[in-house]
Amino acid sequence: MIEFVRGEVAYVCAEFVTIEVGGIGYKIVAPNPFFYRTGDEQVIVYTYHYVREDQEVLFGFRSRRERALFTKLLGVTGIGPKGSLAIVASGDVDALVEAIEQEKESYLIKFPGVGKKTAKQMTLDLKGKLAELAPDYIPSEGLFAQGNAELNEACEALTALGYSEREVEKVKKALQGEVLSTDQYVKRALQLLLNVR
């Protein structure tokens, strides 16, 4: 199985993104393809290889958590890959996990293709099985965790520019799947922050 694809964004459309790796273009169906931009130097897309008799699709996600949620949703009776992808695209992982654990069907029916019956099935099939996706399960690494030195430096620069820890953390999460220089991280983060404000 392919764990992830790291490469340049060659093409983006409403349904998929093409990542070029060593001269080969991987067509990856993603929840929000327009998150990626053509010309991005290096991105990491966490993949799920979906194989059935009649189709073979490579699905891609910005984080391992998104991918884990997608695979859990595939196990729900009545939700296929399209439905799972739409839910991941429309929702926040933390809010969705909370809604399932607390059986908030009114929240779940807001997703495309999810009615009362499917919402009930989601809580029935997934309640108690999403511990690894719950926010308090994730190891608390702090804002400037080890791992990506360039991204951490960019976060420090944003803090020095006066952005709040909350804003910086949000941007850091959005950029974790990308491999950029410190300057490129800062530029990309500022673009994201200016769009939010």
UniProtKB/Swiss-Prot annotation:
Top-level division of the source organism's lineage: Bacteria
GO cellular component terms attached to this protein's record: cytoplasm; Holliday junction helicase complex; Holliday junction resolvase complex
Record GO terms (molecular function): ATP binding; four-way junction DNA binding; four-way junction helicase activity
Residue segments, region Domain III: 146-197
Biological process per Gene Ontology, one example term: DNA recombination
Compartments where located: Cytoplasm
Region (Flexible linker): 141-145
Residues covered by region (Domain II): 63-141
UniProt region (Domain I), positions on chain: 1-62
Keyword list, A-Z: Cytoplasm, DNA damage, DNA recombination, DNA repair, DNA-binding
Disulfide bond sites: none
Keyword Lyase: no
Keyword hit for Signal: no
Predominant location: cytoplasm
Cited InterPro entries: DNA_helicase_Holl-junc_RuvA_I (IPR013849), NA-bd_OB-fold (IPR012340), RuvA (IPR000085), RuvA_2-like (IPR010994), RuvA_C (IPR011114), RuvA_C_sf (IPR036267)
Notes concerning its domains: Has three domains with a flexible linker between the domains II and III and assumes an 'L' shape. Domain III is highly mobile and contacts RuvB.
Annotated family: Belongs to the RuvA family.
Purpose of the protein: The RuvA-RuvB-RuvC complex processes Holliday junction (HJ) DNA during genetic recombination and DNA repair, while the RuvA-RuvB complex plays an important role in the rescue of blocked DNA replication forks via replication fork reversal (RFR). RuvA specifically binds to HJ cruciform DNA, conferring on it an open structure. The RuvB hexamer acts as an ATP-dependent pump, pulling dsDNA into and through the RuvAB complex. HJ branch migration allows RuvC to scan DNA until it finds its consensus sequence, where it cleaves and resolves the cruciform DNA.
Assembly with partners or alone: Homotetramer. Forms an RuvA(8)-RuvB(12)-Holliday junction (HJ) complex. HJ DNA is sandwiched between 2 RuvA tetramers; dsDNA enters through RuvA and exits via RuvB. An RuvB hexamer assembles on each DNA strand where it exits the tetramer. Each RuvB hexamer is contacted by two RuvA subunits (via domain III) on 2 adjacent RuvB subunits; this complex drives branch migration. In the full resolvosome a probable DNA-RuvA(4)-RuvB(12)-RuvC(2) complex forms which resolves the HJ.
Protein name: Holliday junction branch migration complex subunit RuvA
Record organism: Exiguobacterium sibiricum (strain DSM 17290 / CCUG 55495 / CIP 109462 / JCM 13490 / 255-15)
